[in-house]
UniProtKB/Swiss-Prot annotation:
PROSITE patterns: TLC. The gene is LOH1. It is a multi-pass membrane protein. Its EC number is 2.3.1.-. GO terms for molecular function: sphingosine N-acyltransferase activity. It catalyses: (4R)-hydroxysphinganine + a fatty acyl-CoA = an N-acyl-(4R)-4-hydroxysphinganine + CoA + H(+); hexacosanoyl-CoA + (4R)-hydroxysphinganine = N-hexacosanoyl-(4R)-hydroxysphinganine + CoA + H(+); tetracosanoyl-CoA + (4R)-hydroxysphinganine = N-tetracosanoyl-(4R)-hydroxysphinganine + CoA + H(+). It comes from Arabidopsis thaliana (Mouse-ear cress). The lineage of its organism: Eukaryota, Viridiplantae, Streptophyta, Embryophyta, Tracheophyta. This is Ceramide synthase LOH1. It comes from the Eukaryota. Keywords: Endoplasmic reticulum, Lipid biosynthesis, Lipid metabolism, Membrane, Phosphoprotein, Transferase, Transmembrane, Transmembrane helix.
Length: 310
């Protein structure tokens, strides 16, 4: 039986409770992502970046010049954005496919009770939700190392590292403690805006200013709606208040510890959202002043793009 047939034969609707043994799949996904990225970088993104940034004529130049093009900051950062765009788009589509038809996608009360007589923590997970969790956990495990050894160093390196570590801890904690209903919606909220950001950055690197400006505006709007409105006023409201009103605290003596751990991490993410929004707002003001032209990346790079290139 081939890989496709094996995947097709899995009952993705099958329900079971999460176990520590499930986390054994996490290292496999953590290795999967750098492998896929390396292959895409080598055979797809590098050629695409050279084509859209320098044009077809660059393929006729000498090997020395072509090597310099391939190692240029614009090409390197275009490949980074292309990879992130592929991941965030696939992760968003996966999260929506897993959560969209579930009752808790549109009603946060179902994070904790229902359907039927299910009450947290006695809420089994579908196989597809387990896959989503291992997919995301593997990516953020890889991202911690990629931020140090692979990515372009940016001025918000520390903030990004804090975000990746917090997100990974939240994913693992919510999986083990059966808080995956809330976690799955949070994953769906957080990946959408990053798709627009990476499209905008790629457009900027290849000189498509209009598309870059439009993408950045869509990124800013989605950031406000999803991360600064829906996340705090629906998700955090549910994890902070709604859970207290629906879950019997006397049956869960360790509940207060988990409650404060989970919410502390979630509110820390909100602080990061606000920090990044300040940077986004400055970019919006700059974009208006420049009559719609996007002047630079939302997060400034530690190295300049203005170095000489033939």
């Amino acid at each position: 039986m081939g890989l496709f047939e094996s995947v097709k034969s899995i009952d993705w609707e099958q329900e079971s409770f999460p176990t520590y043994q499930d986390l054994g799949f996490l290292p496999l996904f953590a290795v999967f992502f750098p492998t896929i990225r390396f292959l895409l970088d080598r055979f797809v993104f590098e050629k695409l970046a050279s084509l859209v940034i320098y044009g077809r004529m660059s393929t006729n130049k000498s090997d020395n010049i072509k090597d310099r093009k391939k190692n240029s900051p614009k090409v390197r950062k275009f490949k980074e954005s292309a990879w992130k765009c592929i991941y965030y788009l696939s992760a968003e589509l996966l999260a929506l496919s897993v959560t969209y038809n579930e009752p808790w996608f549109s009603n946060t009360l179902y994070f904790w009770i229902g359907p039927g007589d299910q009450i947290w923590p006695d809420q089994p997970m579908k196989m597809k939700l387990k896959f989503l969790y291992m997919f995301a956990a593997g990516f953020y495990t890889y991202s911690i190392f990629a931020l140090v050894f692979w990515e372009t160093r940016r001025s918000d390196f520390g903030v990004s590292m804090g975000h990746h570590i917090t997100t990974l801890v939240l994913i693992v904690l919510s999986y083990i403690c059966r808080l995956t209903r809330a976690g799955s919606v949070i994953l769906a909220l957080h990946d959408a805006s990053d798709v627009f950001l990476e499209i905008g950055k790629m457009s900027k690197y290849c000189g498509a200013e209009s598309l870059a400006s439009i993408s950045f505006v869509l990124f800013a709007l989605s950031w406000v709606v999803l991360r600064l409105i829906y996340y705090p006023f629906w998700i955090l409201w549910s994890t902070s208040y709604q859970i207290i009103m629906t879950v019997d605290k006397e049956k869960h003596p360790n509940g207060p510890i988990l409650y404060y751990m989970f919410n502390t991490l979630l509110y820390f993410l909100l602080v990061l959202h606000i920090f990044w929004w300040v940077l986004i707002y400055r970019m919006l003001v700059k974009q208006v002043q420049d009559r719609g032209k996007l002047s630079e990346d939302v997060r400034s790079d530690s190295e300049s793009d203005d170095e000489h290139e033939d």
